[in-house]
């Protein structure tokens, strides 16, 4: 094993090893000095003189005379240990400060700054230092006694204590030269305050450096705070862009011309003031909000889709229990409601168990003022109960999946053990999930829990901080790989000739989340598709041309004023011979019946409706006898298509958009189904990630890809 001198030095100065070394060197100095002088002076008669000379040597007086070879060696050894002692004292007093000062003074450029060294911040810092050693890391924490700070420095990072809201602290961090700034204090309000302070410091420092863009990542536990974040973004760009071209230099040139023209025209009207607003990119800060609890829910349902252990093709109902309703429980519920839409059309039933269920119910409805019961386009049933009811004799009998989201992991383990002990008769075909945050060791414990000496319980850990707080997740957005590529692929199909590389970063958080949910619902659709393909044994229902024609009549045609308007370009994406086409669509149209494709499209419609409802959208009312004024109103959050599947075709007749051909909006949901294979192959060049048992992707994705590949290669 290669000796790492730098790592040893860091371990030395940031651990108790330095204190121990200082103590040992001090003791050995006294011992050998006293021994040497005692040999010269006499052990008893010269005791006081030897003690005095030992103290003098310890303080740096090396002027001594030794006639005996043993005393001479002893005194020289004492001098060596004295030097080590003083080195330890120096390192104790100044070593840490000098190392940090040297970095801040000369190397704090293009570095990563993490604000907050709590459990989440420490997990991220540790991941960066262990797996991304080319990165320079600087951490600030408000607590000077935080043990994680020393641990970060020992691993090779740099850390200081201070309040990042303070402008002086931000300047000390050289925040204006940072490559990335990640706010993970553990409290939303603190993260927002730091962000606000950063938006004041950076524009001042960067006014002469317009190309120095900053990427800020802010952890927000509550989705309500995304609205506050939007206000900060708007304030940071509060200059309304009445002059806005693609380049700042063009804006400046126009402004310069205006300042020359206006004074001449207004010389006889001195009170006629002009307000000119100019868009400058130099004031832009790229801000991305994230939640590790959303990451946890995302990994859970990508690996283990809702209803994984239920027959959702025929008559099975998915009954989900969420135990503990804090940040993790809320994120799990949000994703469950957004994704829990099945082939058989049955609503998702969710019960939240919490020891303060009435309060949590009220808080949930403040955040999501939605109906809790299935009706109209609502396709879920939600109930809140006291968590004690889960431990009744038949408490878990009706549930398929039970997800423990308590902040106290030990309490969750105890609850599971109690259920196994008292309700063993109801454990068959049940899945238990446990949120483990920083307790990675729970994985092994969960895997070892048994009903008896032979039969294990299916307990699946999720949400370990080492995974959901990693650099690849927080910064590189690795979990969004499929969503990003699906969005780019959509634009390739429908807007050929444009650039897609930076498209994702320009999307609002709402649209980014919309793409995520579309991709994350894919495993639930694929469960049905895989069963349909197996059931059909790869037999063709129709010749492709016949299937395409019937599909066009069913979903792409629209009767307007007794004339049939067909969106032929959209369905031609299934089998284009030139340019971009939807990979795999032709196979799905041939091997799955149109009735089943429509059921899958209805699933997608239910999912799309649920996502918009959860995000505060309502149905845009249609004026009687008139067309819709718009397809959607972003300000009021009203959408004309927030209706049932059966109403889509009729509503499509009254949506008229400038420059766009009339369109049967049923085809949009059908296209999402037909893009299933395309989404997968466009995101993954090979099957390695999909085959990896440790990846976040469920077996349904790889199984589906294999089936389509086999048909293609027939």
Question: For the regions a protein language model found, what residue spans apply to each?
Answer:
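Amphipathic, non-membrane alpha-helical rod segments
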Residues: 629-648
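Cytosolic regulatory regions of ion transport systems
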Residues: 2-575, 579-602, 644, 648-654, ...
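Short, motif-level signal for alpha-helix interfacial/capping segments enriched in acidic residues
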Residues: 486-491, 624-630
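C-terminal accessory/binding modules appended to enzymatic or scaffolding proteins
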Residues: 595-605, 609-616, 635
